[in-house]
Amino acid sequence: MAEVANNEQQAPQFNIQRVYTKDVSFETPNSPAVFQKEWNPEVKLDLDTRSAKLADDVYEVVLSLTVTAQNAGETAFLCEVQQAGIFSIAGLSEPQLAHSLGAYCPNILFPYAREAVGSLVGRGTFPQLNLAPVNFDALFAQYVQQRQAAAAAPAAEEANA
């Protein structure tokens, strides 16, 4: 019986407690002049994720998107969205937990953030903006590789000294 209880405690658990919009901002610094120009924008997407432990096995993950559209050398709009979620995560190893917080949870949050950006851009009366899907697994793997390389660099310098 105790063995069954231990197995249940060690089984991975993942629950979404809440998904919410933490912060939004939409600016059209050059309106109404921007509406008079031919629409041929350069759109730039910056994204960031961060997480914080709220309690035992409870984490907040925040996905921040900043979308900037330049048209004819001027900023047409700047849209910022922070989409957040509270997740219960238990029974994972440290690397698995890091992957969940850095890739899996942002993947859950992205469709909500994408919809918020699209809605704000539409309310600004700009043409529809559909953000392409983001491969958070690949971004997280790249982040891990960069951290490993940064950790290896000082060790290599010490070995050469």
UniProtKB/Swiss-Prot annotation:
UniProt-recorded Gene Ontology molecular function terms: unfolded protein binding
Function text: One of the proteins required for the normal export of preproteins out of the cell cytoplasm. It is a molecular chaperone that binds to a subset of precursor proteins, maintaining them in a translocation-competent state. It also specifically binds to its receptor SecA.
Assembly notes: Homotetramer, a dimer of dimers. One homotetramer interacts with 1 SecA dimer.
Protein family per UniProt: Belongs to the SecB family.
NCBIfam families: PRK05751.1-4 (NF004393), secB (TIGR00809)
Gene Ontology CC terms, in alphabetical order: cytoplasm
Protein's cellular compartments: Cytoplasm
Example of a GO biological process term: protein tetramerization
Signal peptide feature range: none
Principal cellular location given in the protein's record: cytoplasm
Top-level division of the source organism's lineage: Bacteria
PANTHER family recorded: PROTEIN-EXPORT PROTEIN SECB (PTHR36918:SF1), PTHR36918
Name of the protein in its database record: Protein-export protein SecB
Alphabetized UniProt keyword annotations: Chaperone, Cytoplasm, Protein transport, Translocation, Transport
InterPro entries: SecB, SecB-like_sf
